[in-house]
Amino acid sequence: MMPTVTAVSAILPLAILFVFSRALWKLWYLSDIPGPFWCKLTNIPRLCWVRTGRAHDIHYELHKEYGKLVRIGPSMISISDPAALSTVYPTRMGVPKSDFYKTQRPYVPGTGALPVVFNTQNEELHKELRGPVSSLYAMSNVMKLEPLMDETLQVLFDQIDARFVSGTKAFDLSNWLQFFAFEVMGTISFSKKYGFLEAGRDFNGLLSGIWGFMKSAAPMGQMPWLDDVLYKNALAAKLRGTTGMPVLRIVNKYITERITGHAKASSDHADMLSQFLDIQASNEKVPTWAPKAWTFSNVIAGSDSSANSMTTVMYNLMTHPETMARLYQELSEAKQQAGNVTAHILPWTSIRDLPYLDACVMEAFRIHPAFCLHLERLVPETGMEICGKQIPPGAIVGMSPWVINRHKPTFGEDVHQWRPERWLGHSETRLQELKNTILTFGYGRRVCLGKNIAIMEIKKLISSLVLNYEWTVIDPSEYRVENKWFFKQSGFDVTVKHRSSVRHTPRATNMTKVPPTLAIPASSSTVEVRVINTRTIMRTDHSLLWKSPVEGFKGLDLPIYAFLISNGNRHIIFDLGLRQDYENLPPRIAGLLKNAPYIVTEANVSEILDSDDTGLDIKGRDIEAVIWSHHHYDHTGDPSTFPPSTKLVVGPGVLSLTGGGYPKNPNTTVLETDLSGRKIQEISFDAQADSSVKVGPFDGVDYFGDGSFYLLNAPGHSVGHMCGLARVTTAPDTFIFMAADGCHHPGAIRPSEYMALPRDIPKSLVRKLRTAEADSGGKAQDGDTKPLLPFLPALFPDYTQAMETVEKIKQLDACDNVFVILPHDGSLLGAIDFFPRPINDWKKKGLKESTRWKFCQEMEEALSG
């Protein structure tokens, strides 16, 4: 034991001496730079300041107390004098970024941290990444993207008009400007919208994911070694998840789709991803991961920063109405000079050089920069002289944009006040000097690549919002900012109405009331959906549409659709249609069908799968489960044609109702052979169940557990009746809704309070349908928002619940990102893709718009007899 004690006794004094000498060294190193005492010993104060969300204010106050140079860490010096800008941020190489920027890199297991133009410390790598794409960000190239910006502006206007323009409904404008900024970057980067504006909310956790990334990276940047320990290693990534992944997933998805040819750029305007891929393909020196790095920068840095500046301009214009009035006057004159007094989006050439608009934007950049921590640099071996002090090699120096932009000798004593006029009345040379002083976009060789995109986007947006609308902030005192490297703004509740002087003609949307926002859980997972035409035609008489016969009606030929849903290698079938040997159904049902006007059925669904020779190679043996939307004969098909390994999934209460099937239960509609010899799963929509989830207005169950496909509780038509909702694309999310018999005919849900009848529908047809309803004993409904066909109680044992279900379906039917498919909608035949082709690209092909009112033509023909 003695040797151990002796060793400890010898080591302990050495350890104490090391710690003591280290502390003395820290006190001595940079000892001529003033600052708080504890900052000389540790970076912990810096980390704590950032965690408060108001580090920018603390930095400003420190410079008021200690002067131009403040030591805020053992090796870190904060500088407040703009005269040092060209020294700290030169145009030459040799002053690299500090380890603060390591924390800004997303980490991918197996690959490591992804360097991008903004965060790379290796100056040679930075040159390799920036050089090939710098020309894409020149204003001459950015101007080519203007049509894509205008397209997104129109979507924003449509949503403002539909949701808020009454002037009485308050909303947080900062959220909507963030949605807009992200949609712009999505459109110009990928030719895709994320869907934030249409939905009025975050999708796939993208926005919250970026903010969460910044909230963790900003404090870690003050002590970068902590980031390596807590986040940037394989073990941490496995336990905590991968940093930056919501954005990386989107970027990877779109790059893969573009490379494989599954997605294309806008046919009129080459998006940035296309240009990135062309550059990488034509230059062997550019690494293969470069397009990912470039697009990641666009999404994560180019969106939040622009949204911050947009919000700053609008908030200050509203709280300083005299500046709003002056800007409106300038824009009105520019609109007159443009020669199009009805235009609500002015072209870039008309607003680019407007002095007061430019002053407002520059003042926003100055008073509220998007990034408000230090832009750190490592002092090179030659050292630096700053503000008369010699800074030794290895020290870290940096300037905070918040502090530099409030330099009183440069910008005046009122630096904390919004005053766009400070940018007016200068010579061109002096104005450029002022613009070069603000640090909002960085300085020197690492100045922000996307500056021109941001300026154009912000000026386009601000000019449009001011020209077209009158804005009122509800309570300016509720406005909040939180600094976690990026700024997050909130509490900016406003009301809006059209300017009385503007003849505003919104884009036709056929909507009279905005449907409730669909709160569908976010997910990055999708399924592939194929609509199967089961090759069955059933002719129906009036009883599906009206209470009693209608003169001239000769019947409708109704198809039956099933759905093949694929999640990777897992395949399920939603409904099976009518079995081919329907004469073998229970006698009561077989007799009913025998007396039907007309029925033809050519094959069972399993045979349709097995006979496919297109190379898809999804056969009956591959089906994991058959899902019955309900137990009626035209949906249950023949499960016995699938192997015993295929389970049967039914809604709540179906098992007890069917009682083992016919002949065991003589009163049921299904056969014993449908049920026997296979696993049967009865879905529970109990809110306490692990897989239960709220999906828009429906109670649902997440079938695959990844948010790609939901079974929805849709009662009314029968016991255990279910619908399905499949997510078929992300960023933006689009869905296919499988309505089952929640509604039998599109005329029973269209038009609706959310979707008015188009003017091009023949009035003669509308009169016929309204008259037919009255003649058959129903109550004729008038107006362009009432369904053309009645909702018959005879078809729905629980009419109250059925009405609730159909109202929910109407909400989904009115949403641009949901394609509602009714299984008996004959107007879809020949109008959409059927098995074996998938229908995931319905949105891109415009199938919802092209088929929405086709049933009217079908009804006109049916009533011509």
Curated annotation (Swiss-Prot):
Signal sequence, renumbered to the chain: 1-23
SMART domains on file: Lactamase_B (SM00849)
Binding site for heme: 448
One protein family per Pfam: p450
Coiled-coil zones: none
EC number: 1.-.-.-
Pathway noted in the entry: Secondary metabolite biosynthesis; terpenoid biosynthesis
Cofactor entry: heme
InterPro entries, per database record: Cyt_P450 (IPR001128), Cyt_P450_CS (IPR017972), Cyt_P450_E_grp-IV (IPR002403), Cyt_P450_sf (IPR036396), Cytochrome_P450_monoxygenase (IPR050121), Metallo-B-lactamas (IPR001279), RibonucZ/Hydroxyglut_hydro (IPR036866)
Protein keywords: Glycoprotein, Heme, Iron, Metal-binding, Monooxygenase, Oxidoreductase, Signal
Gene3D superfamilies referenced in this protein's UniProt entry, alphabetically: Cytochrome P450, Ribonuclease Z/Hydroxyacylglutathione hydrolase-like
Biological process annotations from GO: secondary metabolite biosynthetic process; terpenoid biosynthetic process
Stated role: Cytochrome P450 monooxygenase; part of the gene cluster that mediates the biosynthesis of anditomin, a fungal meroterpenoid. The first step of the pathway is the synthesis of 3,5-dimethylorsellinic acid (DMOA) by the polyketide synthase andM. DMOA is then converted to the phthalide compound 5,7-dihydroxy-4,6-dimethylphthalide (DHDMP) by the cytochrome P450 monooxygenase andK, which is further prenylated by the prenyltransferase andD to yield farnesyl-DHDMP. Further epoxidation by the FAD-dependent monooxygenase andE leads to epoxyfarnesyl-DHDMP.
Protein name: Cytochrome P450 monooxygenase andK
Natural source organism: Emericella variicolor (Aspergillus stellatus)
